[in-house]
A protein has these predicted regions:
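Alpha-helical scaffold/interaction cores of sigma-54-like transcription cofactors
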Residues: 1-294
């Protein structure tokens, strides 16, 4: 993080449970005082937790690549890798993939796939139970249709493609191939692990989460443009947190492009609740989520 700041990379003040650690604050891993804001250390680390605690770090989008290059140069190309992800075959995709191999006409494949209810995580077994029309197609006189549904049910849940984790990076003290199998990955010079995140951690390797956050890029560009156009140099880290004009904008719902405050629903609640201090915004951001809203 020190190197990132030295390179001019925008670094987020703290994300997730790590903000509850006073040690992280003192080391400037985070910039949020957990004692001042009453944050819980136990969310970060407690006796019931077996795995290493997570420290998620936000960088501006371009800066994330610069930080990755720094890490590779510091620790070595053979000690740094992305984490592989596995994409499995869901119900609709299983039907479409099998239909393509079976050479089932596209219109029939579309019709079968559209009979599966639009619900995340639904399985073909559930779809057959809920949609009699789809279940009936398993006994279709058209052999291709019946076989497509039969084979789709067998292949459902199989790994269909691989990718790399959006932010997870493994850094080892020795060459990673001493501990886990590696592979090349598309669109990156780094290796990727052939174990996914949960297995990588069970082997004992440390996972770091480097996130590229568009909002930090926008703030960074805004600061640069203000300096160019107005000659005013703004230090984001020393901005006052009690500026009345800023809270007036929040109270009026004028928050377009403000991270997590730009939705129509949030703007409505801002106009209703009229926040006038930082703690009000913290509470609103925490509560405006599906669970608390219910």
């Amino acid at each position: 993080l020190h190197a990132a700041r030295e390179m001019g990379v925008s670094v987020g003040p703290g994300r997730g449970s790590a903000a509850g650690s006073a040690v992280a604050f003192c080391l400037r891993i985070t910039d949020i005082d957990p004692i001042k804001y009453g944050l819980l250390f136990e969310r970060f680390l407690n006796s019931g937790r077996i795995s290493m605690p997570d420290i998620d770090i936000d960088f501006d989008e371009d800066g994330r690549e610069a930080v990755l290059k720094y890490v590779v140069n510091k620790y070595g190309h053979d000690k740094v890798a992305h984490i592989i992800t596995f994409g499995s075959m869901a119900a609709k995709m299983a039907i479409r993939d099998v239909a393509r191999v079976q050479k089932l006409p596209l219109q029939d494949a579309d019709r079968l796939a559209k009979l599966v209810p639009e619900r995340p995580g639904i399985t073909l077994a559930q779809a057959f139970a809920e949609v009699p029309e789809l279940a009936k197609e398993r006994e279709s006189s058209n052999k291709l249709i019946a076989q497509t549904l039969k084979y789709a049910a067998v292949l459902e849940g199989s790994v269909r493609q691989t990718g790399v984790h959006a932010c997870g990076i493994i850094i080892g003290k020795d060459a990673l191939d001493n501990y886990i199998p590696l592979c090349t990955a598309k669109d990156t010079e780094l290796y990727a692990t052939q174990y996914d995140g949960s297995h990588v951690e069970s082997v004992g390797l440390l996972k770091m989460d480097f996130l590229g956050l568009k909002t930090l890029s926008i703030i960074k560009d805004a600061v640069i443009n203000i300096k160019k156009s107005r000659g005013i140099e703004i230090d984001i880290e020393t901005l006052p947190l009690d500026d009345k004009k800023t809270f007036d904008l929040f109270s009026n719902g004028e928050t377009t492009a403000i991270f997590q405050f730009e939705s129509t629903g949030m703007k409505r609640y801002l106009r209703d609740l009229k926040p006038n201090r930082l703690e009000d915004l913290i509470a609103m951001n925490a509560l405006y989520r599906p669970g608390p809203m219910e």
